[in-house]
Amino acid sequence: MEILQIVVLSLVVSSTATLFSFLIGFFLSLFIFLKNFILKKWLINFLNALTGVPTVIFGLCVLLLLSRKGPFGSLKLLFTPTAIIIAQFFLLLPLVIALSLDLFNGEGKKILETCKILQIPKNKIAKIFLKELIKPLVCIFLIAFSRAISEVGAVSLVGGNIKGHTRVMTTYIALSTSMGNYDTSIIIALILFVISFLINYLLRRKA
């Protein structure tokens, strides 16, 4: 029963964080792609740099924000599933934006140029743009979800790995292994492996 609860919680928090980061990241990257503004190049380089920052740093930042002495301490979100979602959201957002910008600057530009040559009405360009890029966008979503569900450091910091409340697959594996409970660790690891395998399979199908 505990294993099922851990798996469900992992899927729920990771899916929620991925969905929000993907939706917001998509529109932000589209805005950056279409608009010319001061420091645009610097912003893109900064976002790309954030994708390589150790995940535990994102967890620490969220921890400081949600801690009792932090600016959002009154919300009492620390060591809750919501805190995990927030940490994963900030972890995934730069990744989604960076990957989306790469897509827009590559295939996206070609689509817009083709639409311009063919003199396609502006009200139809958005529909064509999304239709042509739907498969790579789904790939970006799956990549983000894969990173979210495999996260350990940030999740441990803000979630606390509390049994029956904030314990997810990765933190459970880390704790059980440290305590010598290899049997249950292997079961959870196999479940996580199957999920990762399915994501990889879907990515190959969409590619």
Question: Where are the model-predicted features located?
Answer:
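Transmembrane alpha-helices
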Residues: L19, L99-S100, K122-A154
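Transmembrane-helix boundary motif in ABC transporter permease subunits
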Residues: T16-L47, G106, K122-I125, F129-L130, ...
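Periplasmic/extracellular loop-to-transmembrane helix junction in inner-membrane transport proteins
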Residues: M1-T16, L34-F37, F129, S178-N181
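Membrane-interfacial helix termini and adjacent extracytoplasmic/periplasmic loops
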Residues: F58-F89, V158-I162
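C-terminal transmembrane helix and the adjacent membrane-cytosol boundary/short C-terminal tail
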Residues: P94-I128, S185-A207
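Residues that define the loop-to-transmembrane-helix transition and helix capping
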Residues: V12, I38-K41, P54, P81-T82, ...
